[in-house]
């Protein structure tokens, strides 16, 4: 048996330290509460974000109004007019990335109808606006929607 193996007997309890009973006890005078101040007084302490009567940070900030949908899907937008320079007939997320029209392949892509199109393209994206679909099909192309998880 060594000193670090010593343990109190099972079920034994230690007497609580009596505070405020003289300097010799080690917990005399201020009873472990330090010097003056609100925390040294009897009764509850001020709440955690209390700033001493100054207008609190929570009240200095403007209201956050409205609601944020956690499941909102952010789309990378590509316009029909951006696809004009396309020589290749297939428009896919990978091809758009190579050309530099999009940066992130993880974000789904939506094609919008701004601009004109006179080349037949096979467009494979996650979403297409009605006007973009109309312009692509009018130019002799086709639209195929792909799953967002893919």
Curated annotation (Swiss-Prot):
GO BP, one annotated term: translation
GO-annotated cellular components: cytosolic large ribosomal subunit
Region described as Disordered: spans on this chain: 1-56
Coiled coil region boundaries: none
Gene3D superfamilies in the record: 3.100.10.10
Residue ranges with Basic residues bias: 14-26
Gene Ontology terms for molecular function: rRNA binding; structural constituent of ribosome
UniProt keyword list: Ribonucleoprotein, Ribosomal protein, RNA-binding, rRNA-binding
InterPro entries the UniProt entry points to: Ribosomal_uL15, Ribosomal_uL15/eL18, Ribosomal_uL15/eL18_sf, Ribosomal_uL15_bac-type, Ribosomal_uL15_CS
PROSITE patterns: RIBOSOMAL_L15
PANTHER family: 50S RIBOSOMAL PROTEIN L15 (PTHR12934), LARGE RIBOSOMAL SUBUNIT PROTEIN UL15M (PTHR12934:SF11)
Its biological purpose: Binds to the 23S rRNA.
Family listed: Belongs to the universal ribosomal protein uL15 family.
Subunit field text: Part of the 50S ribosomal subunit.
Protein name: Large ribosomal subunit protein uL15
Gene: rplO
């Amino acid at each position: 048996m060594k000193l670090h193996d010593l343990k109190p007997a099972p079920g034994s309890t230690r007497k609580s330290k009596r505070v405020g009973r003289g300097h010799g006890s080690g917990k005399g005078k201020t009873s472990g509460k330090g010097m003056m101040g609100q925390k040294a007084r009897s009764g509850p302490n001020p709440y955690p974000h209390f700033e001493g009567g100054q207008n609190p940070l929570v009240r200095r900030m403007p209201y956050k109004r409205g609601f944020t949908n956690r499941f909102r899907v952010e789309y990378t937008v590509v316009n029909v007019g951006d696809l004009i320079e396309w020589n290749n007939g297939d428009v896919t997320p990978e091809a758009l990335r190579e050309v530099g029209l999009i940066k992130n392949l993880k974000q789904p892509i939506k094609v919008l109808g701004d601009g004109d199109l006179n080349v037949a393209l096979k467009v494979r994206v996650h979403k297409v606006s009605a006007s973009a679909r109309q312009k692509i099909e009018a130019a002799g192309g086709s639209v195929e929607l792909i799953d967002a998880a893919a």
